């Protein structure tokens, strides 16, 4: 009888021990699930919390190792300790990897931590952005788009350098395109039928002054040359949502009214007093209608100078606008990536594809050869 009792007690003890072990494992799993995103994370202190964030720039940028992006920010200079490096030997320390969309063949070796996609090019020239399978591999976006997780448009706050006075502007329309995208060049060609356009770029060039100084600072030279023109053609290479680049900054800096062809969302890049600083091609039925308006303004100093009000009044209130937040950011863009990671602001199911239809002649009311 005693032997039977001992066996029963031993069996019950064994069952109780197994139960306790299972309970501990379940509890550890629950804690782990609460503290880790599905794509993985790195904890770097004793209680499992992350105290510093290391992002490895895994790809090149247009084939060049981007060593210029490297830097580190201690807590205080950034809400979290943050480091960005191109040192791939530190792969086991990584909190995230960043990949440039135009160098998308360089994929990180592990998906145990988030992947960040960086681009300042639009989907027409970067087809992977419209590839659902490719985009689903990434968990955070840093791009030119103002609706990106981390907006990083190629468009800086314009300066308030006074413009050349109206009476001293000797040129009418300035243009300098290096990419001869066919629709914008056809529009410019038709515009030239009704109004003089001085073209310094590689497309329909009729002026050579800019070519002579191309070996210096090209963008600075372009800005300085355009200062004596009343208008500058700012025709972006496609009409993709939010695609705005430094062409518009250069024209605004020069005090030469930008004549803009591109995204319907351009107003989101023109907060405060900049709202009335540009002329939008889309507001005109044809190149002839646009030409008539530009000629009218060129002979009306008061109306023309209304586009320059922001130069004297300042940019104005840009609080609460996405582009204003970008211009007035307290922390560098690299730090903002670390903050997004620390707050768990990642897309665990991946990013959505970004569609963009290639520009067509009919989008701008023109017929080729007309």
Regions found by a protein language model. Name each.
Residues 2-99, 103-118, 129-370:
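Pol beta-like nucleotidyltransferase catalytic core
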Residues 121-124:
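Catalytic toxin/effector domains delivered as secreted proteins or via bacterial secretion systems
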């Amino acid at each position: 009888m005693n032997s039977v009792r001992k066996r029963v007690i031993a069996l019950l003890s064994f069952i109780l021990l197994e139960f306790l072990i299972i309970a501990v494992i379940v509890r550890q799993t629950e804690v782990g699930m609460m503290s880790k995103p599905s794509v993985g994370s790195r904890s770097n202190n004793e209680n499992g919390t992350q105290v510093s964030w290391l992002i490895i720039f895994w790809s090149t940028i247009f084939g060049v190792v981007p060593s210029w992006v490297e830097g580190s920010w201690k807590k205080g200079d950034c809400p979290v300790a943050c480091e960005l490096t191109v040192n791939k030997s530190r792969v086991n320390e990584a909190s995230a990897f960043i990949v440039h969309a135009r160098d998308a063949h360089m994929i990180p070796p592990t998906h145990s931590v988030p992947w960040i996609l960086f681009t300042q090019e639009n989907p027409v020239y970067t087809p992977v952005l419209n590839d659902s399978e490719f985009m689903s591999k990434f968990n955070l976006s840093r791009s030119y788009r103002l609706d990106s997780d981390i907006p990083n448009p190629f468009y800086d706050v314009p300066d308030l350098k006074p413009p050349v006075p109206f009476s001293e502007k000797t040129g009418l329309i300035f243009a300098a395109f290096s990419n001869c995208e066919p629709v914008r060049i056809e529009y410019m060609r038709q515009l030239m039928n009704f109004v003089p356009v001085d073209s310094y770029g590689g497309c329909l060039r009729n002026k050579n002054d800019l070519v002579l100084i191309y070996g210096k600072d090209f963008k600075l030279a372009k800005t300085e040359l355009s200062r004596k023109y009343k208008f500058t053609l700012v025709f972006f290479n496609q009409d993709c949502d939010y695609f705005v680049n430094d062409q518009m900054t250069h024209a605004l800096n020069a005090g030469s009214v930008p004549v803009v062809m591109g995204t319907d969302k351009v107003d989101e890049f023109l907060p405060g007093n900049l709202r009335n600083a540009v002329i939008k091609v889309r507001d005109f039925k044809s190149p002839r209608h646009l030409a008539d308006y530009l000629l009218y303004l060129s002979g009306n100093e008061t109306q023309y100078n209304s586009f320059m009000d922001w130069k004297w009044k300042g940019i104005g209130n840009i609080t609460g606008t996405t582009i204003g937040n970008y211009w007035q950011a307290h922390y560098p863009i690299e730090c903002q990536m670390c903050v997004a990671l620390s707050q768990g602001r990642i897309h665990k199911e991946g990013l959505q594809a970004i569609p963009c239809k290639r520009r067509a002649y009919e989008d701008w009311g023109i017929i080729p050869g007309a």
